[in-house]
UniProtKB/Swiss-Prot annotation:
GO molecular function: asparaginyl-tRNA synthase (glutamine-hydrolyzing) activity; ATP binding; glutaminyl-tRNA synthase (glutamine-hydrolyzing) activity
Subunit structure: Heterotrimer of A, B and C subunits.
Catalytic reaction list: L-glutamyl-tRNA(Gln) + L-glutamine + ATP + H2O = L-glutaminyl-tRNA(Gln) + L-glutamate + ADP + phosphate + H(+); L-aspartyl-tRNA(Asn) + L-glutamine + ATP + H2O = L-asparaginyl-tRNA(Asn) + L-glutamate + ADP + phosphate + 2 H(+)
Gene Ontology BP, a term: translation
Known function: Allows the formation of correctly charged Asn-tRNA(Asn) or Gln-tRNA(Gln) through the transamidation of misacylated Asp-tRNA(Asn) or Glu-tRNA(Gln) in organisms which lack either or both of asparaginyl-tRNA or glutaminyl-tRNA synthetases. The reaction takes place in the presence of glutamine and ATP through an activated phospho-Asp-tRNA(Asn) or phospho-Glu-tRNA(Gln).
Keywords: ATP-binding, Ligase, Nucleotide-binding, Protein biosynthesis
Gene this chain is encoded by: gatC
Name of the protein in question: Aspartyl/glutamyl-tRNA(Asn/Gln) amidotransferase subunit C
NCBIfam families found in the cross-reference section: gatC
Length: 100
């Protein structure tokens, strides 16, 4: 399946990203190859193969949930350059304030 440069531009725009024409062309090519590989994997016969949900040993996956005291909020904010009502203030990264 071919991913077009227009599709890459559309998704980039939705993500508030900008790419050069060369980058857009390279992304379209790379994404097309990835989709082709996934389509190839979909052709593999997995009938009768047990479902694998994890490769980790499940013996230690969960632990007892024990409440522990946290850090002193005032101590945590000592090194914060700007804050208001225990929120850290950071510079805006979107010129128009954005909708994110």
């Amino acid at each position: 399946m071919k991913i077009s440069e227009e599709e890459v531009r559309h998704v980039a725009n939705l993500s508030k990203l900008r790419f050069s024409d060369q980058e857009t062309k390279e992304f379209a090519s790379s994404l097309s190859k990835i989709v082709d590989m996934i389509e190839l994997l979909n052709e593999v016969d997995t009938e009768g193969v047990p479902v694998t949900t994890t490769m980790a040993d499940r013996k230690t996956v969960m632990r007892e949930d024990i409440a522990q005291p946290g850090h002193n909020r005032d101590d945590l904010f000592k090194n914060v350059p700007q804050h208001q009502d225990y929120y850290i203030k950071v510079p805006a990264i979107l010129e128009d304030g954005g909708d994110a």
